[in-house]
Amino acid sequence: MKNLTLENIARVCGGTYYGPADKLQEEVMSVITDSRKAEEGCLFVPIVGERVDAHKFIPQVMEAGALATLSERVLDNADFPYIAVESSLQAVKDIAEFYLKQLQIPVVGITGSVGKTSTKEVIASVLNQKYHTLKTQGNFNNELGLPLTVFRLRDGDEIAVLEMGISDFGEMTRLAQIARPDTCVITNIGTCHLENLGDRNGVLKAKTEIFKFLRPEGHIVLNGDDDKLITVKEYEKIKPVFFGMSNECQVYGDKVVSRGLKGMTCTIHLGDTAFTVDIPMPGRHMVYNVLAAAAVGNIYGLTTEQIKAGIESLEPISGRFRMIETDKFLIVDDCYNANPMSMKASLDVLQDGAGRRIAVLGDMGELGENEVQLHEEVGEHAGKCDIDVLICTGKLCRNMAERAQRTNPNLKVIYEPDRESLLEHLEGYVQDGDTILVKASHFMKFEEVVTKLENM
């Protein structure tokens, strides 16, 4: 890893090196926090968690061939190199910031209330048509996950597409300091993490912290149909590029046609050029993700042919609108996370399903003092949708179920108090030929519901 010598690591994280002097100039081969991934030449960063203190794994990591380890305490009688630091978490962020600077490659930072992951996937797919692109994997988008993503970069990578997720003020500033993006993309401002951020104005303030470490002559790409983002006129003399359905946006879409659960077709207008794309994922919200990707592709010099190819070769990922066909059902696996905006969008897509259309929904978390009202609003939306069965699970989802039934007395609404009860009764609620949407916040562990359906 470029310039990641033990000497540089100790210096950038303010640590004290203990060990043989002849090891100081050796470069680490990888940086890990999971002791099970120990390999020859790695640097181990033991994180102190709520349940596990990873310092206890230091001996086995060193035995597996690690070059060195960080440690928040002095290790008496250690016969291996280590760097004593005040905080392993802060150290790993400092090291990641240093390492990314050494590589000197463009960085696209992506945030927003809804659609971060899908937008990241499309942008990476587009950029990969011209550049060797590294993207965030899974949910590695927080103060630990972002550094670990950065450490996956190697000399052959030409651009990084980094997802940045937050739940409180100040977090984005810390993430942006590591990433220092050339291009900042904000998908939208919704009702997420209101427990800490208060309201949508708070969400806007927290998300736009990403601009604080925007590199000079950088770019800002924003959703021009979002009433909060449209108020961002410029930052440090950098004027945003807006995308949306309005022809007042620099990048806009029209002639949007649904192909059911197979995807969408739309025309993208990019400057004086217009071209049609087939989006291989359903939902009008996907059009916005694609427009953001087109804007970013244009910034980095891709042709319209390359942008189109990147969009049309997109592959869905687990838990994010992935279609699973079994012998009995079509499962719409959207269970990774949920908030009111994404929940409504998923219900809209479900209406295009064949057979009985069943929504299996669970509680949404971190919504603050308006959590009951926001669940009721989703219930009202469900009641107005052309679906056949609504199954609500969780304490807060009782409010969703009740509002849905009041909105549409003809809708079959089922309430289960918890996931265990749902799993016990689920087989009796579904039948061959159903299209089944599964969606809830991550803490509800609805991937177990998807697995149950797959195995029926």
Where are these regions (language model features)?
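Mobile, glycine- and charge-enriched loop segments
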Residues: 35-46, 151-159, 347-368
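N-terminal leader/targeting and accessory segments in enzymes
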Residues: 1-94, 282, 352-355, 380-381, ...
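Short acidic-hydrophobic, aromatic-tinged amphipathic segments that line or gate anion-handling sites
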Residues: 83-87, 412-422
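Phosphate-binding loop of NTP-binding sites
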Residues: 7-11, 91-224, 230-236, 297, ...
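Active-site beta-alpha connecting loops in nucleotide-dependent enzymes
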Residues: 51-52, 317, 335, 339-408
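ATP-dependent carboxylate/acyl-activation modules
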Residues: 110, 318-320, 443-451
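Acidic, Mg2+-coordinating active-site environments of NTP-dependent enzymes
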Residues: 12-16, 71-79, 185-331, 355, ...
